[in-house]
Amino acid sequence: MERAVLRYKNSVISGLIINESNGLITLKASNGYNMTFDRSEVEFIERKKEESPERKSIEAVEKGQGDRKISVLATGGTIASRVDYETGAVSPVSDPELIFGGSDILTRFTVAVKPILNEFSENLKPADWIRIGQAVADESSEADGVVVAHGTDTMAYTSSALAFMFERMRVPVVFVGAQRSSDRPSSDSRENMQAAINFAGTDLGEVGISMHASTSDGHVSLLRSVRSRKMHTSRRDAFESIGIPPLAEYDGSVKFLIDYRRVSDTVEFRPDLDDRVSMIYFHPGLNAGDLENMIAEKHAVVILGTGLGHMAKDLIPVVKKYTADGNYAIMASQCIYGSTDLNVYSTGRELLAAGVIEAGNMVPEVAYVKAMYLLGQYPHDLFRDLFRKNMRGEIVERDLPVEIIKLGR
């Protein structure tokens, strides 16, 4: 880490150098903003190296006086972090009041924050999904609800994995993320977490995601994990419910919008996953050799095809050989909204003849996770039938118009 003081035109600016490449230099200024300059246009007044601060873990803490206990499992991510503008480090928030302050959460609930991981979500692997799931299962014996604080980038993967691994749930499980850290005035972390706690205090018997319903404050949606997807890089309402309305909304109280699975008297957690599954985005120019290399040694592959679920005809023989060897090829659509239909055009019919399984209107990432779950849990000869079975609400009978979904009607 380097701290610098530089002159740009008539201004003197100090801060931390966070990137320097391709003739550009990016500085995290003392006011917290990132500023990028053409290297040739700045003059360094001072530049010195400093030891990078350690990445700290959030501390375990329990607060509140409420009768119902909610366990918050911290895995990393923006939701429970703040930026130290003096050092440039991202540090965890260890005091729940920084997230829950200004609400009555701690008078109605007892909140126990427990760290189980401290990773950016893009670094999480299927083994980490199992670890998170086991922690949720352990907490289910004592808590009335479990909230998992998670980075948003891969939250849909992890939450969907838990949705499949939990055959029965004794308490609600709600994932929560944030697009902006808690130190920023525009942070969504506090509202998302407060809503998540309230969602976790219901009789929900499935895995949900708690995120802003719009760019404005005041409304937070609870999305069914297996119908959710991050659809924007930075907006506070980055997550969308694909093809169905949100499960519920929170605007000071919880209101369920559609039918949902209720909690059970017992917990059944089945953690075995087969991670030899791949996901491939078809694109013009993808050749047979590259496709063969991508799917080699994989037990299943989810292909994101064009439109109704197509790929170039010269790749179909590769897929046919792959399925003939006892593996599974699943066709999803790059369009996200709508459903695959391989019976409309000749290419689709050739893919069906090659042994391809349609994902229908499953979200592609969910199809990927479901394949891992089925291969890890059931005899492989059941895979085709089970994949087409609606197990956790991952398949919908019909897609609703986007306008209706946004309105939650």
From Swiss-Prot:
Belongs to the asparaginase 1 family. GatD subfamily. The active site is at 78, 152, 153, 230. GO terms for molecular function: asparaginase activity; ATP binding; glutaminyl-tRNA synthase (glutamine-hydrolyzing) activity. Heterodimer of GatD and GatE. HAMAP family: GatD. GO terms for biological process: amino acid metabolic process; regulation of translational fidelity; translation. It holds the Pfam family Asparaginase_C. The keyword Protein biosynthesis applies. Allows the formation of correctly charged Gln-tRNA(Gln) through the transamidation of misacylated Glu-tRNA(Gln) in organisms which lack glutaminyl-tRNA synthetase. The reaction takes place in the presence of glutamine and ATP through an activated gamma-phospho-Glu-tRNA(Gln). The GatDE system is specific for glutamate and does not act on aspartate. It catalyses: L-glutamyl-tRNA(Gln) + L-glutamine + ATP + H2O = L-glutaminyl-tRNA(Gln) + L-glutamate + ADP + phosphate + H(+). Keywords: ATP-binding, Ligase, Nucleotide-binding, Protein biosynthesis. Residues 68-390 form the Asparaginase/glutaminase domain. Its EC number is 6.3.5.-. This is Glutamyl-tRNA(Gln) amidotransferase subunit D. SMART domains: Asparaginase.
